[in-house]
A protein has these predicted regions:
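Hinge/cleft segment of the Venus flytrap/periplasmic-binding protein
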Residues: 29-30, 169, 189, 288-336
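A conserved helix-loop-strand patch within extracytoplasmic ligand-binding domains
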Residues: 138-168
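Hydrophobic alpha-helical
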Residues: 88, 97-116, 185, 203-266
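Extracellular/periplasmic periplasmic-binding protein-like sensory domains
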Residues: 182, 186-199, 226-227, 231, ...
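Signal peptide-proximal N-terminal region
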Residues: 57-72, 191
Length: 336
């Protein structure tokens, strides 16, 4: 009798378990992952664009909410020595993985050596870390997207007219990122307009100077159509101001790099790119999505922690965002 009762109870136990009753499941293993961010100093932006370290960190905080991760955060503050100290602190905290964002190659080599000694894997953001998979932008490709957009605009709207290219931004910045973007822009334009010449206006890292520099240029270059590529979105805003003040809206067009809040506006009412503002001289901006890095990088981290093979380099999805697709890429409400 006891045996029959036991057999009868088994289907009931199975049914209860299927409804969530019964012994608690241990759940998935949780991992400790550290992000050592490049620089979270207020007012400091990343990679010559308009994104801040705080925005990048927030994307990791939000993306981690649905993953079995316990996150630790470090601010390298743009200091190689501090980056090494932060890596040592992550090792002492016995993290399962370090996500390192540091621009100094010597410091990265030392960080990689210490991580290897501790047996801790790493993911690198933007700048290579020896032995680590890399996630970051493809600056040359992003530049080409802008250049092709400008070339196509001139072909479709200004055929057989006198056209000149203008590149505005921090042209003297250290590192390869700016030079790669400039090379991509020129290649992209020349795919449509092989003989186009470019004027270079260097803001020296001060986007506000784009207004005055372009104003002087517009006063000299009259009677020409101008294809303007700005290397950051705030420079695009100031360039647009110069065009408006000089009443040159009919013969200037701008494509920028970044797609930060200066251009897409987020949830605010002030938007440079807007379906209701299709007459703007700002045609669009090439997206870098640095404010969404967490959503792309943490899945890579989970794959590494699961023992999967991850490509040596994963590049950001770059896309030209205009008034026609801005609400698809950055809806006018808080996505988080």
């Amino acid at each position: 009798m006891t045996g029959r009762l036991h057999l009868r109870r088994r289907p009931l136990l199975v049914a209860l378990a299927s409804l969530g009753f019964g012994p608690a499941s241990a759940g998935p293993r949780r991992f400790r992952v550290a992000l050592a961010n490049l620089d979270e100093t207020p007012g400091t932006t990343l990679e010559g664009l308009g994104f801040t370290g705080a925005e990048l960190r927030l994307s990791f905080e939000l993306a981690a909410r649905t993953l079995p991760l316990d996150m630790l955060y470090f601010d390298n503050a743009g200091d190689p020595a501090r980056a090494i100290a932060n890596a040592e602190a992550a090792i002492a905290a016995r993290v399962d993985l370090l996500i390192e964002y540091n621009a100094d190659a010597d410091a990265n080599a030392e960080i990689a050596r210490r991580l290897a000694t501790a047996g801790i894997p790493a993911l690198a953001l933007v700048d290579p870390l020896p032995g680590a998979c890399l996630y970051g932008p493809d600056n040359l490709a992003a530049g080409r997207i802008a250049g092709r957009a400008l070339g196509a605009f001139a072909r479709d709207n200004w055929p057989d007219e006198d056209v000149l290219g203008v590149i505005i931004g921090d042209l003297s910045a250290n590192g390869p990122a700016i030079s790669e973007r400039v090379a991509g822009i020129t290649e992209g334009v020349h795919a449509t307009l092989p003989g186009l010449r470019f004027a270079l206006l260097d803001t020296g890292g001060q986007s506000v100077r784009a207004d005055g520099l372009l104003t002087k240029f517009l006063q000299v270059e009259r009677g020409r159509r101008l294809l303007i590529a700005t290397l950051d979105d705030l420079s695009a805003v100031y360039a647009r101001n110069a065009i408006d003040m000089n009443r040159r809206q009919s013969d200037c067009v701008i494509v920028s790099q970044g797609l930060d809040r200066n251009i897409h506006g987020g949830v605010s009412e002030k938007k440079e790119i807007d379906p209701n503002n299709r007459g703007s001289v700002v045609l669009g901006s090439v997206a870098y999505f640095m404010d969404r890095y967490g959503y792309d990088v943490l899945p890579l981290a989970m794959r590494l922690l699961a023992g999967e093979t991850v490509p040596p380099r994963t590049v950001t999805r770059h896309v030209l965002v205009t008034a026609t697709n801005v609400f698809r890429e950055y809806p006018p409400f808080d996505m988080n």
